[in-house]
Structures are given as structure tokens and as C-alpha cells.
């Protein structure tokens, strides 16, 4: 209910304001209280300035309250002090009470109130200006003066004798700006003397009570002083001076003569005497002066001296001057000032100044003791350099600038009482420049040498700036740890840095594209020949895939992770799926016609099988033939291979059985990889498209072939031990598992790394040699090792010659690294 009432009131007010805005009428503006003033500390008045009336007749009401009362009163009299004012008479005025006064303006629409003003009567007292100011000139005793008269300010309710006013008078010539103010006192008239004849003057008067402020100045009154005869103006004594503390002289300045010849008389009297004396000598010291010789000069006596000007009309007397001869001593300036420029043995010039004391000062007898002070400056300078010399009459000055002209002056004063004399006449001295020629030459030489040194240093910095900077600020050496990339330390992430340092807290990363091994050529024995094979058999679909796990946990077994190689395999499967419709018979005919070529081609992406669950090196499966044939050589790459082929040629391979201490290292067979063109590659891929994962194998000789070697074993190349751009690749053998049994091999050492290059064949085949280490060979295999050593020389040449006869189509078109293991040429016997 209240909200509805409030909203209705707001709507009504809105309509009212809208109506007022349309008619141009509004409530009155805010009034402002200008001032409150008491004329005589018994009554006071307040004035205000009204605001806008809002287009309607407006009434103004003054309300006040006293500090000791809560009652609010209205103004007692609105007409006594004029419009927009309120007059408080004696009955409504209390000098010791503070009033709180506000003014309210009201019309038909609304009202508005002024800001409150607090009034204390004693602080607002300011009388009116005096009235009835009159000016007239009069002559008395042949002297013309100005007489000014006025009346105190009028008071309404008080008699003229109830208050005492003090007055001030000011006057000036009409054409001037500055006023001359005279304090009059309580009297209401004043005589003004020393007015100039023929000048028009302006006069004003004001007053003040014992409390409060001065009143305003009265209205101006003007008067013209006539040009008639008048007495002389009052003269002014300028000074008195004793040059040697034995005699003294006084000088005065005369005023206007009043239009008549004027005589000036100096009168003096001594302390303790009533007799008045006249000046003994008006001529010795010049006009308007009086000279007191030794007879008329007394020490420790005070003289009262005045000057009187007299003409036919009247006379005037100066203000008195009290003189003690001891304190008016001011000697004449020194004389005989001489300047002499001298030079010492080292030819540095200096200035010698000499002078004489004033001739009237009795310095020899000790009656006067004088101190001296000199000043000098270059002729073109403005400021002087002042030097106190003391009682000596000569002075030496050093460090003068050559080629300049100096001005020198000297003055003096008594050591106890008195004042400084005037400065002596100016003396000039020109300092020659020939005294500094040697120094100038030295500075010129120094400047030239400095310039040459700067030029040489600048030229050196331009030519060899980098060397100098490197010499002055040698570079901070970086860490020289093998395998640490300095660029990786600066910009690499923490994971990359930890991986490079070999920490296993983060999975290791590397640039796999740069570290891939594209080809491996492996030959098992010296006696085996790489001959074409007529067996076009393919691995059975029922072939058992056995997962092999390497024991090398070096972290560098393969630069490729299984995820990267699996992506490669997926890409090849997409290509092979489009080629499954091709007739396999045509491929077999092509393989019969070019049997050795087709067996040299293997699928690029289906060589590798991975165990994605392993966190170690990838697991490489080996295929087992269905007709219980012994397993062939299986090639398992650890790098991202773009085009890899294995030549499955009927050769009689005798694997070298090795065994290490942990019985997990496989032997190192060698196979030959030859690159073929894309057509042959696609044909062979069709043959293997039905199998998701295959292992390229190298078949052994037929059973009826005679071979002095034992049956070959499955040889797995599973890890690259060291792969770097600036080093050779080292291949480690993989663990071999067959039918749940771990075959034990004999390893010629704890590990074998192919790090030495034996020879280069056909500019693209490297023959790698392993490191020579201590070989642990069982006694049962010593005859086999001896036979392999006997057959090594002859068989190596045959194998090398066969590798050279491989058609160019089987070779990789692009440059690749092909590895041959000469250690595999050594036969082994069971």
C-alpha cells in the first residue's frame, strides 16, 4: 500500500514539474548572504543577494537564532538599512552573542534557503567614513600651509560623544600614483606643510574605533596651491664624514626656495652644552657643506646639527642629526695604484699590485690603522672578484688568463670604527699571450696525439672488432660432454634434455628420420655362393609367429619406436589391398622367368612385427616353415626402412654359432639387400598380401646339396647398438627362442660392435669389422673355427665377386648404407 502511495506521489510531482517546465515558472533560486557589519558596536545590519525569482513574485525572510537559545527569530527591521537587508537595533543586538542567520526565498511553487552565516558583533565592527571633509590654504608667520577639516561618521541612535575615533589622512599630487599617509589621531583637523606652489593635491580621510576594522576612505577632495610667494622647503642633511679622524665635514640638500633667494645656515650644539654654534667654514668642503677643522672638532663628543633655510617669506629647519666623530670616519681611497706583470724562472706570469694609503690619513704615527680590499675583473665581464688584502700595501695575483685585459680597484677602512672608502680609480692591465705559447704547443701536441690514438683504435675496432671483443670478453665455454647437444641445452625442453642425458624418467626421443638404417647386407659364410633359387615357395599361412625379445636394454636398440613402424605398415597394407586382384599365376611366371629378382624383393612395410606391449626394445618374431624345415635367416630391421628387399637365394649357409655369458646374444648373419623398381616390388607384394605379418627369410640349400656346414639357424638382426650421423652403425644379435627352448650361442666376447670399416665395394657397400675382443669358444668348436679360418680367404673373394654381379635393378636407386659382416664368413661346426 505504501509503495502504491509513493508511486502515485511521484507521478503527481512529475506532472507538476512538467507543467512548470511548460509554463517557464519554477521555485526561487538560492539567496546568498553578502555581509554583516556593525557601525558602532551597538547595532548591526546584514545584506543578502537574491537568486532568481522563478518567474513569480518572491518574498525573502531572514531568520536567526542565538547560540544560547533554540528559538528562531525573524528580522526585526527590513527597511532601515535598505533593500535586501535586515537591521538589528540595540534591543536585538548583544555584543557577546553569536548569531546563526539564514535567508529564505519563497514563491507560489516552492522555497529555497541560503547557507547559514555565523555572526559575532565584535568582529564585524566597521564605522562609516568621516564626512564633511574641507580643505583650505592659510599663511601664518610668512608660511603657507594646508588646513584639512572633517566630521565623524553620523550615528543614528547614539550621541557623538559616546565613541572615540582615530583618523588617518592621505594626500598626493594629482598627477602621481603614490599616496603620502599621515596619522592624525583623534582630532578632526590637520595642517599640511611643505606643499609645492602651483601643484594640485588630492586628500582623503578615514577612521577606526578601538576594535574592528578601518572604515572606507572618504570621498576625494581636491585643492590647488597658488603660485604666490612662500617660505622655502625644509632642507635635508645628507651625511657627515671625517677623512682622518681629526676633522669632519657635513653636507645637506636644500629644498625649494619659495620663489625668493634663500640662505642656509648650519647650526650645532655639543652634548652637555646649551649654546648653539654656527658652521665655522662653508667653503672648504664645497657648496651646501660645512667643514669642521681641528679646532672645532672634539672626540668623544656628540654634535647636534641642523640646517635652516630662510627667505623673505619665511624659514624652515631640517631634522636634527646627531654626530660622533669616531663613527663617521671614512678615509679617502688609496692612491698611487700600480700594476706590474712579472714572470718567474719557469716563465709563469703573475701580477704585482702596489698602492699608497690616503694622503690625509696619519698611518705612520699609528693614529689610523687601515685595512685594504681590492677587486678585479676582465674588461668584458660583469661580476667583480673581491680579495681582502689586510694592512699590506702590495699583493701578488697568479693564474691570470693570457690575452685578456683586467680592471683593478682598491679601497680601505679603519680597523675599528668607520666605513669603507670609495673605490680608487680604475687601473687597466693587458696580459700578453706570449707567456703561454709553450703550454699551447704542448696542448696542441697532446690533442693531435689523442686524435691519432682515437683514430687508430676506431680503425682497429672496425677491422678486428670481433677478435678484440673475444680477447677482452672471452666466450664462456659450453659443456663438452659427448652426446650433449649444446643447442638443446639453450633452447630444448626438459624432456629432451633428460633424454639426451640418458635419464629414464621421460621416454627417450630422437630424430628417427636421420638415424634410419636403410639396407643391411649379410653373408653367412665364405664358402656359400649367392646363387639363384628355383624355389618359389611362400611362407605358409599357418606358420607360427614366435615373438623374440632382445636382452639389450641400452635404450638405443632401435631408433624407431613400434608405433612409428606400425604406421608405416598400415600405409603399405592400404597399397597392397588394391593389388590383391592381380593374378598370382602371372606373378609366378614372372618369378620363374626372373626368379632371382623376385626373391630379392620383399614388402617394405611387412618385414617387421612388433610387440606394442613391451616397454623395452621391440620384439621381433621369426617365421617357421610348415614342412619342418629348419628356420631360415630372418631379417628384422630396427629402423624406418623405405625400400628393403632380401635376396632369398639358394645358398648353403653355415651359421656361426656364438654364445655369450648370458646366452642371449644371437650370431651375426649377413644378407644382401637389393633394391628393385616399383613394378617388381608391387608384384611381390601381391604374393604376400594375404599375410598380415611376414618375415623375410633366406632359404638354405636343398637337402640333397652337399655342404660341409651344419644346418643354418635363424639369425635375427634386431637392434642397432650405435647409430649416429657421425659414426658407423653397430648391429647386435637378438635372443633366439625355438619351440620353447633357448639356444645357446657362443659370443666372441661380452658384446660385438661393428665400428670399423674394412673396405668399400661398388661405392655403396661397406664391409664392417667388429671390435677385436677376447673370444670364449668351446673346445668342441675349435676345429670348426680352424676350418673357417682356412676357407676365409678363398671364399671372401667369391662372395665379393657375386655381390658385384647383382643386377643394377636389385640395387637401391638412392644412396643407402649397405652392411656386410665379414665375421659371418667364418664357418662353424656342430
UniProtKB/Swiss-Prot annotation:
Q: Which parts of the chain does the record assign to the membrane side Cytoplasmic?
A: 461-830
Q: Which cysteines does the record link by disulfide bonds?
A: 36-46, 75-86
Motif placement: Box 1 motif = 472-480
Q: Name one GO molecular function term.
A: metal ion binding
Question: In the record, which residues are listed under signal peptide?
Answer: 1-23
Looking up InterPro entries in the UniProt record yields: FN3_dom, FN3_sf, Growth/epo_recpt_lig-bind, Ig-like_fold, Long_hematopoietin_rcpt_CS, Type-I_Cytokine_Rcpt
GO CC annotations, alphabetized: external side of plasma membrane; plasma membrane; receptor complex
UniProt-listed SMART domains:
FN3 (SM00060)
* Keyword Glycoprotein listed: yes
Q: Which UniProt keywords apply?
A: Disulfide bond, Glycoprotein, Membrane, Metal-binding, Receptor, Repeat, Signal, Transmembrane, Transmembrane helix, Zinc
Q: Where are the transmembrane segments?
A: 440-460
Q: Where, subcellularly, is it found?
A: Membrane
- The entry's Zn(2+)-binding residues are 415, 417
What are the residue boundaries of the Fibronectin type-III domain, all occurrences included? 30-128, 129-228, 231-331, 333-434
Q: Which CDD domains match?
A: FN3
Domain comment, in the record's words?
The WSXWS motif appears to be necessary for proper protein folding and thereby efficient intracellular transport and cell-surface receptor binding.
Q: What is this protein called?
A: Prolactin receptor
Organism, scientific name? Columba livia
Whichever gene encodes this chain, its name is PRLR
Amino acid at each position: 500500500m505504501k509503495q502504491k502511495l509513493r508511486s502515485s506521489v511521484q507521478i503527481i510531482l512529475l506532472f507538476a514539474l512538467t507543467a512548470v517546465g511548460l509554463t517557464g515558472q519554477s521555485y526561487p533560486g538560492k539567496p546568498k548572504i553578502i555581509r554583516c557589519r556593525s557601525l558602532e558596536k551597538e547595532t548591526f545590519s546584514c545584506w543578502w543577494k537574491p537568486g532568481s525569482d522563478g518567474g513569480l513574485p518572491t518574498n525573502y525572510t531572514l531568520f536567526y537564532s542565538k547560540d544560547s537559545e533554540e528559538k528562531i527569530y525573524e528580522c526585526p527591521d527590513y527597511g532601515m538599512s535598505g533593500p535586501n537587508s535586515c537591521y538589528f537595533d540595540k534591543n536585538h543586538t548583544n555584543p557577546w552573542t553569536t548569531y546563526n542567520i539564514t535567508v529564505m526565498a519563497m514563491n507560489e511553487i516552492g522555497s529555497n534557503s541560503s547557507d547559514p552565516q555565523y555572526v559575532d558583533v565584535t568582529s564585524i565592527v566597521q564605522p562609516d567614513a568621516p564626512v564633511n571633509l574641507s580643505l583650505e590654504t592659510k599663511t601664518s608667520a610668512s608660511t603657507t600651509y594646508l588646513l584639512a577639516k572633517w566630521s565623524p561618521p553620523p550615528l543614528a541612535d547614539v550621541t557623538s560623544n559616546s565613541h572615540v575615533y582615530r583618523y588617518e589622512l592621505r594626500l598626493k599630487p594629482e598627477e602621481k600614483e603614490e599616496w603620502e599617509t599621515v596619522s592624525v589621531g583623534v582630532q578632526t583637523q590637520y595642517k599640511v606643510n611643505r606643499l609645492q606652489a602651483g601643484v594640485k593635491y588630492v586628500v582623503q580621510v578615514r577612521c577606526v574605533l578601538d576594535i574592528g576594522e578601518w572604515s572606507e576612505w572618504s570621498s576625494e577632495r581636491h585643492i590647488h596651491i597658488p603660485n604666490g610667494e612662500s617660505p622655502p622647503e625644509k632642507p635635508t642633511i645628507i651625511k657627515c664624514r671625517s677623512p682622518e679622524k681629526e676633522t669632519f665635514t657635513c653636507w645637506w640638500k636644500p629644498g625649494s626656495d619659495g620663489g625668493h633667494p634663500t640662505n642656509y645656515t648650519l647650526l650645532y650644539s655639543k652634548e652637555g652644552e646649551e649654546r648653539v654654534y654656527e658652521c665655522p667654514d662653508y667653503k672648504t668642503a664645497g657648496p651646501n657643506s660645512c667643514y669642521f677643522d681641528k679646532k672645532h672638532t672634539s672626540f668623544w663628543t656628540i654634535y647636534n646639527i641642523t640646517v635652516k633655510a630662510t627667505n623673505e617669506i619665511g624659514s624652515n629647519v631640517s631634522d636634527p642629526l646627531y654626530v660622533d666623530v669616531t663613527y663617521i670616519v671614512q678615509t679617502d681611497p688609496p692612491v698611487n695604484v700600480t700594476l706590474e706583470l712579472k714572470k718567474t724562472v719557469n716563465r709563469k706570469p703573475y701580477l704585482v699590485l702596489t698602492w699608497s694609503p690616503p694622503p690625509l690619513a696619519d698611518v705612520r704615527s699609528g693614529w689610523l690603522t687601515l685595512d685594504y680590499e681590492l677587486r678585479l675583473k676582465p674588461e668584458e665581464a660583469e661580476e667583480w672578484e673581491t680579495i681582502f688584502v689586510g694592512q699590506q700595501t702590495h699583493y701578488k695575483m697568479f693564474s691570470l688568463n693570457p690575452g685578456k685585459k683586467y680592471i683593478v680597484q682598491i679601497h680601505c677602512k679603519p680597523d675599528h670604527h668607520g666605513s669603507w672608502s670609495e673605490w680608487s680609480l680604475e687601473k687597466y692591465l693587458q696580459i700578453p699571450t706570449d707567456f703561454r705559447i709553450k703550454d699551447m704547443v704542448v696542448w696542441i701536441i697532446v690533442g693531435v696525439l689523442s686524435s691519432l690514438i682515437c683514430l687508430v683504435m676506431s680503425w682497429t675496432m672496425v677491422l678486428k672488432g670481433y677478435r678484440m671483443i673475444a680477447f677482452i670478453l672471452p666466450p664462456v665455454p659450453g659443456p663438452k660432454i659427448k652426446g650433449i647437444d649444446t643447442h638443446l641445452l639453450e633452447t630444448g625442453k626438459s624432456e629432451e634434455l633428460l633424454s639426451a642425458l640418458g635419464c629414464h624418467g621421460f621416454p627417450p626421443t630422437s630424430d628417427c628420420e636421420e638415424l634410419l638404417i636403410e639396407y643391411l647386407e649379410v653373408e653367412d659364410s665364405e664358402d656359400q655362393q649367392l646363387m639363384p633359387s628355383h624355389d618359389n615357395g611362400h611362407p605358409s599361412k599357418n606358420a607360427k609367429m614366435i615373438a623374440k625379445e632382445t636382452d639389450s636394454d641400452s635404450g638405443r636398440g632401435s631408433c624407431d619406436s613400434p608405433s612409428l613402424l606400425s604406421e608405416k605398415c598400415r600405409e603399405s597394407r592400404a597399397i597392397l589391398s588394391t593389388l590383391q586382384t592381380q593374378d598370382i599365376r602371372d606373378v609366378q611366371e614372372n618369378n620363374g622367368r626372373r626368379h632371382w629378382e623376385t626373391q630379392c624383393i620383399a614388402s617394405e612395410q611387412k618385414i617387421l612385427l612388433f610387440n606394442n606391449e613391451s616397454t623395452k626394445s621391440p620384439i621381433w618374431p621369426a617365421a617357421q616353415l610348415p614342412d619342418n624345415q629348419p628356420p631360415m635367416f630372418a631379417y628384422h630391421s630396427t629402423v624406418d626402412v623405405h625400400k628393403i628387399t632380401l635376396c632369398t637365394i639358394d645358398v648353403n649357409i653355415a651359421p656361426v654359432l656364438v654364445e655369450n655369458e648370458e646366452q642371449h646374444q644371437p650370431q651375426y648373419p649377413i644378407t644382401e639387400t637389393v633394391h628393385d623398381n616399383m613394378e617388381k616390388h608391387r608384384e611381390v607384394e601381391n604374393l604376400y598380401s594375404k599375410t598380415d605379418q611376414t618375415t623375410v627369410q633366406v632359404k638354405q640349400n636343398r637337402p640333397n646339396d652337399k655342404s660341409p656346414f651344419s644346418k643354418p639357424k635363424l639369425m635375427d638382426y634386431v637392434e642397432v647398438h650405435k647409430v649416429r650421423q657421425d659414426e658407423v652403425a653397430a648391429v647386435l644379435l637378438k635372443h633366439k627362442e625355438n619351440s620353447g627352448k633357448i639356444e645357446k650361442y657362443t659370443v666372441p666376447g661380452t658384446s660385438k660392435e661393428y665400428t670399423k670399416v674394412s673396405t668399400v665395394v661398388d661405392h655403396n657397400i661397406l664391409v664392417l669389422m667388429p671390435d677385436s675382443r677376447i673370444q670364449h669358444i668351446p673346445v668342441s668348436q675349435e676345429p670348426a673355427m680352424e676350418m673357417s679360418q682356412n676357407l676365409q680367404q678363398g671364399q671372401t673373394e667369391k662372395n665379393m665377386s657375386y655381390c658385384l654381379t647383382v643386377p643394377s635393378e636389385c640395387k637401391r636407386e638412392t644412396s643407402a648404407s649397405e652392411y656386410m659382416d665379414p665375421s659371418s664368413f667364418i664357418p662353424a661346426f656342430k
